[in-house]
């Protein structure tokens, strides 16, 4: 996929850079693999804001993605590559030999007409899904499981991948894009290749309104608030906050480590950079 620039006939087009989607499917998604999705506006079941600056946005249909790849030893053909508004990666509609359809994350270089399969004996080919114990060291992977049978959780965003760097004592060692080295059980599945749409990181939305279409509201600075709303708020005239940066609840921010899950720390061989 290439990037698309525009002639500046309006101010919002001057800086706009988008991913060229001309090669993607232009019709509607497969109805049997979609469902409605409710907007939360960043609120939880008590109505309290748990994710700031969310709300509005274009109505979407959720595409049901197969992260587990549980149809073993049944080959499938790629019918089309589609845009998915719910994620940065593209998705592929595949049709199995028994007639069943499914959506999977589309890796780079997967094209219409290609065949994919989930099997222990599958070839090391783009889009095929295998247990880590059957994949040679040095292979680039995506959609990697962390628990057997739970479905892929690692490397699902546009352009991402992990590298298989070792196997030992029932675990595979994978290297993440962040520089972290992590242990994953050898029976966990992973898919060959890198995720599609690597140019996603280079886009420029061009105007605030386009962010609103995506469901993002304005990010208000703490120093622009009142004292009741934020520790940085208040003061006579414009102030700098008067203290080290903190969250609305007073905890240090901008670099302070916040990871709490010590239970899984034993699976991290080397921390991220």
From Swiss-Prot:
The keyword Nuclease does not apply. It comes from the Bacteria. This is Large ribosomal subunit protein uL2. The gene is rplB. SUPFAM superfamilies: Nucleic acid-binding proteins, Translation proteins SH3-like domain. It comes from Rickettsia massiliae (strain Mtu5). PANTHER family: LARGE RIBOSOMAL SUBUNIT PROTEIN UL2M, RIBOSOMAL PROTEIN L2. Pfam families: Ribosomal_L2, Ribosomal_L2_C. GO terms for molecular function: rRNA binding; structural constituent of ribosome; transferase activity.
